């Protein structure tokens, strides 16, 4: 495993941990809030942003190895 892959894995793990804690806090806010629609919107935005960030990090980690594999496939 390359150091870059390890870094991506650590970032994804901490992002997931942060997302779980933030979701727990926002769900408590949703229960006690008078404006539940705003709290639900915040929860949705944070969840989508975190999932897209993790997906982008995984994609950019796998992209160079996939590109290198295609180069090897076409030239050798």
Curated annotation (Swiss-Prot):
Record topology, Cytoplasmic segments: 56-76
Gene Ontology cellular component list: membrane
Keywords assigned: Membrane, Signal, Transmembrane, Transmembrane helix
Subcellular location(s) of the protein: Membrane
Domain of life: Eukaryota
Residues exposed to the Extracellular side: 26-34
UniProt membrane topology term: Single-pass type I membrane protein
Signal peptide feature range: 1-25
Sequence intervals crossing the membrane: 35-55
Coarse class of the protein's main subcellular location: membrane
Protein's UniProt name: KANTR integral membrane protein
Source organism: Homo sapiens
